[in-house]
Structure formats: structure tokens, C-alpha cells
Amino acid sequence: MTVAVRRQSRHCSAGSNSAQPNNSHEAISRMDVLSERIRDFHYNEDQTHAQLNRKLQLRDQLYYAISPIFPMCGLYIVGSSLNGFGTKRSDLDLCLMITNRDIDQRTDAVVVLSSVMRTLESNQIVAEQNLILAKVPILRIKFIGTFHDITVDLNVNNSVAIRNTHLMCYYSSFDWRVRPLVMVVKEWAKRHGINDSACSSFTSYSLVLMVIHYLQCGAQPPVLPNLQQMYPKRFSVRADVRTLNVSLPFEPIPTAMGWQFKDDATLSELLLGFLRYYAFQFDFDADAISIRMGKKVNRAQVAQNQSLPFQDIKKAFVDSYREFFSQEAITKNEFNFLYKLGVVNY
């Protein structure tokens, strides 16, 4: 699997979504300001090529340190560093593949990570290691010297993470608006206290899926298609993860899919449509998201982790959506709204 990030985006997408601003000139101006702020925020926070190259160098050094004990292994970058949603502050997630078969994450993965931990104890660039026992155990590694600002989370044989990274990379590159929208939604969720897996709220990956689902099913017309349905061979679960390549361009879209590109909706319209969709149209008690199926599914049909009370999660969407359209103290509300989204600072 190549580790080069696809930077070319398709400038194609959907028309106006369900969030309809007031028709006044003042409301339209506010929408323009918000779109510009979102673009600036993404530009300032987006992971740079230089940062990615440093992560690639660190990955290579770790591979050369680990490969003597696992000669046939592969070491893959996964997560936000590669899928297009990385920021300047993103950690480096790595997946060590030692076999094509699944392993027991509760026992075998811990044994492998313990071996890696012992091997890296004498490595000159390693400052600290911590083995974290979870559903998918990880070895957290901190460094000194050149890579002191990068933290690595290493897992073993979590092939799902490689497949998800491959899929998310193509979604993030399909339309230029996807990345800035995801970035500002993550920051908004963090400011509202609902982007912290340690507190049983949304993980960053869950928020990415929520944005993609909205762009597939909530925006009218849709901004994103169902890529797994459109390109079943490319995203087949049977594909060998070692052959996945995030730099290959898409084949022409099959005419049978009937997909049409539109580029009418602004970032602000899509953001407010996202808030409106989860505030008023998505039932957190009954609905779940399926990116693979490209639709909402019954929540009872899928396993769900315990999360914050649904009314607390829903309240953040409702409050943010209503605040933007409040007619009282428009200038103050606009500034507060942008601040809570994370696109301005006091």
C-alpha cells in the first residue's frame, strides 16, 4: 500500500442543502463570512507535506528497527495522517502487519507489542513507551531529538484500520469541500465537549463518518456518492491490504450509477445543513449510520457503545444551528458562533 497522500481533489459536488439562510442581504453576507472563515481555518490547520514527510521518515526508522524480529512484516500509516483529514497536531497511527490472518487482539497482539517494546528500549530516538490494553491494544511511543513532537500509536494486524484509511482517503479527495467541513466539525465538537472518546462521546473518526453520511444522505442533492457501491472491486473486503494504493485515480464513474456533479452549496450552507440534519432529522435513539450501505439503518441492528445521553449530544447541534439564525445581536452571535466552531480566537 503506497503512503502518498492524494492531494488532487475533484471540484464537483452538490447543490444547496437543507439549511436555508434568511434571504436578507445581512444573512447572505454572514454566510459568505462563515465560508471564508472555514476555508482559512482549514488552510491554517491542515497537515503540510513537510509534516507528512517527517512521519514517513519516522515510519521508515521504526520499520528498520522492528523488521529484524518480524522479517516479513509491513508497517503501514493509518488514520488521519494519511486519509486526508490530518492536522498539524495529528499523531502518527501505525499498523504492524505480521501475517495476513487475523490474530487474537487480547493475547497475540499484546505479545507482539511487548516484543516490539523490548526491541525499542535500546533505540536512541525512543524516549518513552506505554502499552495500552484496549479492544485493539496499542503501543504508544514518544521520541527525543528530531521527532520529539510526534507521538506514535502502534497496533498489530488491525487490517480494518488500513481498509478504512484507504476508503476515507478517497472520500476526502472526492470533493474539495469534504476536508474543510470535517476539520471545522471536529473543532466544533471539541469546543462543545463531544469529541472525547475518554468521556464516551464521539471519536474523531465517528465525526468523519457523520459528515460523510450527511453529504451522502442529508445534503440535497448529495455531495458524495456511495464509493463502495460505485467501485466494488476497489473497496472489496477481500482485497489484500498490502496491495491497497491511495494514489490511484478513479476510473470513470459508471453511467448506470446516474451520478451527477454539482458545485452549488457553499461551505457555510453545508455546515449549517450538517447541524440541522443532526439536530432535527437524525434520531439518535433509533438511527445508526452505514457508510457501506449509504443510508441510515436501525440502531438496534448494530452494536453500539455506551455514549453521552442522546439529548446532551443533540442539544449541541440544535443550539449551534439556532444561534446562527438568531436575529438578536447579530454581530455578537456571528462572532460567538465562529468562535465556538473554532475558526476565530479571542
What do the PLM-derived regions correspond to, one by one?
Residues 75-85, 112, 129-138, 198-206, ...:
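Short amphipathic alpha-helical segments embedded in low-complexity Lys/Glu-rich regions
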